[in-house]
Amino acid sequence: MTFTTQPALSKWLKELEDSVGAPLFERHARGLKPTSQGHMLLGHARRVLSEMDRAQQNLAAMQEGSSYRVAIGTSPASAPNLVPAAIIQFLRLHPNAQVELQENTMNVLLERLEQGQLDLVVGRFDNFAPRHSLCSELLYEETMRVISRPGHPLTSQPSLDWEALHAFDWIMWPVGTPIRSKLDITLTNAGQRPLPYRVESSSLIANLWLLQLSDMLSIASDRVADHFTQRGLIVPLEFELDALGTLGMCWRKGTESDQGIADLLDSLRYASANQIEFPDTR
């Protein structure tokens, strides 16, 4: 381990600031605080370190016989079959590749993408704001559906209104998530009061189980609803929810020149366009 004395560190920092031509840190009694220029430089440094780490991982993968190692991030409310179908398509193109899959909120995933910890992020674009360092592409738009368990009292009714939906407790996605924002906007536009909810959850699996064990209601995108309806887990209710959601993918500018990333992007496009479904193996 190498130790650096404070005078030597101060001298090095001064030389770095002279080289950059801008102050990078503010000096305080309790230490240093990055300036706006310092924050920017730290961001670049983190991305460089992440890229070096990813390069080491790819080299190690190649030594073990793998051709590529890619890292994908996806949000919990994304279509459950889209990313897995894209991964299968990518592995057909690169049989020896390794794929890492992370699930989190879009804000967290986009930060990791910018820092070089992820190669691609797939998620809802409803609240997405463009970022200078990222490219983005819309994959599809879809409607939102109100869902319940099979056999729910509302499933036998040919048509529903807001009053009927307010009569039951709800499972809500957390405030700030794209799907929750869409629902809140829909309620506002319809002049409706907030829906009563008992549970606020960002876990798709937990939400499905909660629906199975109760008469609570929730909301899902059309593709998610279709996917789990085919497996007998939920039923979309006969209610037209005036909400349209979007799903897309993001990647760092310039990385599409890498053949592995280019093939990963094409695999997402293929899976999105072909609506790949997995068989029910129950």
Residue ranges and their predicted role:
Residues 15-34:
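A short LG(V/I)-centered, amphipathic sequence patch enriched
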Residues 43, 47, 62, 85-89, ...:
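Short beta-strand-centered segments that line the small-molecule binding cleft or hinge
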Residues 63, 133-170, 252-254, 259-262:
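Flexible hinge/capping segments at coil-to-helix
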Residues 67-128, 193, 201:
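Central regulatory/effector-binding core of bacterial HTH transcription factors
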Residues 82, 235-278:
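A late-sequence structural motif
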Residues 105-118, 124, 178-235:
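Hydrophobic hinge/microswitch elements
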Residues 124, 148, 154-155, 168-190, ...:
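Secondary-structure junction motif
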Residues 130-138, 142, 205-254:
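Beta-alpha-beta core module
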